[in-house]
Every structure is written in C-alpha cells, then in structure tokens.
Amino acid sequence: LKKYIVVGAGILGASAAYHLAKAGAQVTVIDRKDKGQATDAAAGIVCPWLSQRRNKAWYQMVKGGARYYPELIKKLEDDGETETGYSKVGAISLHKDPEKLEKMAERAAKRREDAPEIGEINILSPEETQSLFPPLSSEYGSVHVSGGARVNGRAIRLALVRAAKKNGTTFIEENAVSLVQDKKRITGVHVNKQVIEANQVIITGGAWSQELLSPLGINFSVRPQKAQIIHLHLENTDTSSWPVVMPPNNQYILSFEEGRVVVGATHEDDVGFDLRVTAGGVHEILSKALEVAPGLDESTMVETRVGFRPFTPGFLPVIGPIQGYEGLIVANGLGASGLTSGPFLGLELANLAMGKETELELQLYSPENAME
C-alpha cells in the first residue's frame, strides 16, 4: 500500500487527501491550523465563465473546477456529507452599460459551447436584477447565468476533511518541522519529534509553503496577498436563494442562509501575514459594496475574516513534482480562485501522485514557474 503525506489542509490539501483516500491509499495529513488560512476566510463564487482574464491555462483550470463541483458534491453525499456549503443559486454580473452586458452575454454564449454547465444566459433589466437581489441599486442591469454557484470555504473544507477521515485518513494537528531526506529522495516528514514515512510528500501549504522548501535550497516564491472579507446580517430576510453578485468593480457580494450576506474583498500585497482588520480595508469594502447595494446599509456587521491568498509571481497556480527531487510534489498559488479550482486540482493532484492520468496538461503549471 502506497503511503502519502499531505502537508496543509486548506481546500487543496483537503481535496487531495480525500481523493487519495477514496482511491484506497494510506494518507496522513499534517496541518498546524495557522490563523489566516485562505480557505477558512473565503466565500467562493463559482462562475469563471464571464472572466476577461486571457490566460488559457488559468481558464482551463477554473472551467474544470466549476464543472467538477456537482460530481464532487454527489461523492461527498454518498459519504454522508451533506453540509458542503455549495449551492447552485445562479450568478448575476452587473453593469450600467447595456453594450457591456451584450458583450458579456456573447462571451458566455461562446464559452458555453464547451462548457454546457454554464446553463441559461439572460440579460436582465435593472428591475429584474433588483428583484433577484433586492438590496441592489436600481442602476444596474445584469447578465444572469443559471449555472453559477456559491460555496462556503469553511464548510466545503470540513466536509472534505470528514469524508477523508471516514475513508481512513489520519489527521495530525502539528507543525511539519522539516522534510526527511535521503540524498535526493524525500522519504517523509519530521513531526513532533517523530518521523512519518511516505512514498510521496505533497506540500499544499499555501502562503506558508516556503518554510519547508527553504532547507532544501529551493527558493519557492509564493507570497501572501491579504484579503479582508465582511459578513453582514439582514434581519427577517430569506437570503438563501439569492444569486451571487459580480459588480463591475473588483468586489463580490453573495448571500448564504439565514440572512447572511458576505461582501469583499481587499487585495493587499506586501503586508505579509498581518491578521488585523483595518479601518482602510473595511472602508474600501463597505464603500464599494454600498455603492452597488445601498439596501445593505441597515444590515448588521457580524464579523470580518482575514485570509492570505497564495500567489505565484506569474499569478498562475503551480502543480507538479520539484525537479531534482524524488517523492516531492507541490501545488500552490491558487490566489483568488482557490474555491473554484481547489477541489478539482485536489483530484488532479491525487491522480498525479498515484501515477494516473490527469485532465489538465500539467506541464503548463510547472513549479519551475514559481522558482527564483
């Protein structure tokens, strides 16, 4: 029986562990529960098809991520996990300019040819838009995509962790101190004064991954980008089926059950692992959110979450073995699309580790791209 160690149990590590365990492998997950885990703070909008980002490798990854969700949710339900935080509530992308909405709808229709999961695409008037998400300003029309979904990062991660445990995965809440090395082969991990051995060590430590790789002389340049995300509450309002909202600025608004509305997020570079909720961050989020959805001005501020998104220098995730070493795989840099692509990349990572075929052309995501 092959043994695998996964270091870091955010969305990516939790998914990799689950898929390895489902395939019958022996899996140990090591996670030290740092504050500021990106997955824990994040509220995911699963609607990659309207993006104007031109990078084809990135789009293939997020498209695969969105497509895989319903299948994964079914697998988790078969494992008795129904609290996944995922719901296909549809998405609306807002704009004041009708021409921009036309172009957006055209882009979605073109992409639907190889992504039927997009579902129905409709251009909605400001009135129709507001009827779907009542707090919105009446200035915005929208493109509605029925296949859009939301996901609660904390809930999907915990569902994957519980399901991985049911399939025999061992979880250790400790710091993975260092990798065990035999010449150029990685054979395990030092944890809590003991050694855990494995055929493959998979590092999915997000913004913290460099710590394990530095002692090997590997300069893995993944940096944290700080996100602050605000949770609001609307009294006596059923928000459970409202669509996710993508305004024309770089923010998002989405609702969950029981009146909870999430608005975010900041994109703060070069502040390191600063966990503070800042006046400027809250001001930026709320001023942008209330401009788009003035009906939220009477909502209660419940909490502000902070997470550190891992980014590579080229902003494209990396996944693969580290050249010059055997038994060592890294996957990282999911950035702001981790909840869209993470579960799918975890499946790809499990297949890669087991020597099975992957769906993506993984050479496009070589870890060399994040080496300095």
List each model region and its residues.
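Short loop/edge segments at beta-strand edges and connector loops
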Residues: 31, 125-126, 172-175, 303-305
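C-terminal catalytic lobe of FAD-dependent flavoproteins
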Residues: 293-372
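Dinucleotide-binding Rossmann-like beta1-alpha1 core, especially the glycine-rich loop
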Residues: 45-128, 132, 288-290
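Active-site substrate-recognition segment that forms the wall
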Residues: 15-23, 30-32, 44-45, 81-86, ...
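Short beta-strand to alpha-helix junction loop
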Residues: 60-64, 96-103, 143-162, 276-281, ...
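Helical element adjacent to the flavin cofactor pocket in flavoenzyme catalytic cores
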Residues: 142-192, 196-200, 210
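Beta1/beta-strand and adjacent pyrophosphate-binding region of the FAD-binding site
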Residues: 1-10
